[in-house]
Amino acid sequence: MARRCEICNKGVVAGVQYSHSHRQSKRTWAPNIKKVKAIVKGTPKTVHVCTRCLRSEKFKELYKKSLAKMQFNNCIFILHKNKG
C-alpha cells in the first residue's frame, strides 16, 4: 500500500529512537493511511487518504455538497470505505 496521503502529501518520516541508556537505533514513523473509494473528476477511484484528512471538516463538507448537488468538478468525495 502507498505510504503517502494523496490529499496532504503526508508520508513516512525517518528518525532516531533513544533507549533509556541513550543508545540509538534508526526507525521510521508511518502515517495512518486508509484506502477509500472516491469520485475524482467524475470517475470513481481508490484513493489513499490519511485519517486526519478523512476526519477533516473540509473533506466532510465536500462530501455533503456532492451528495446534495452531485457536482464532481476537480474534487474528491467519499463513496464508502474499503473493509480490510
UniProtKB/Swiss-Prot annotation:
Keywords: Ribonucleoprotein, Ribosomal protein. One of its GO terms (cellular component) is ribosome. GO terms for biological process: translation. GO terms for molecular function: structural constituent of ribosome. It holds the Pfam family Ribosomal_L28. SUPFAM superfamilies: L28p-like. PANTHER family: 50S RIBOSOMAL PROTEIN L28 (PTHR39080), LARGE RIBOSOMAL SUBUNIT PROTEIN BL28A (PTHR39080:SF1). Belongs to the bacterial ribosomal protein bL28 family. This is Large ribosomal subunit protein bL28.
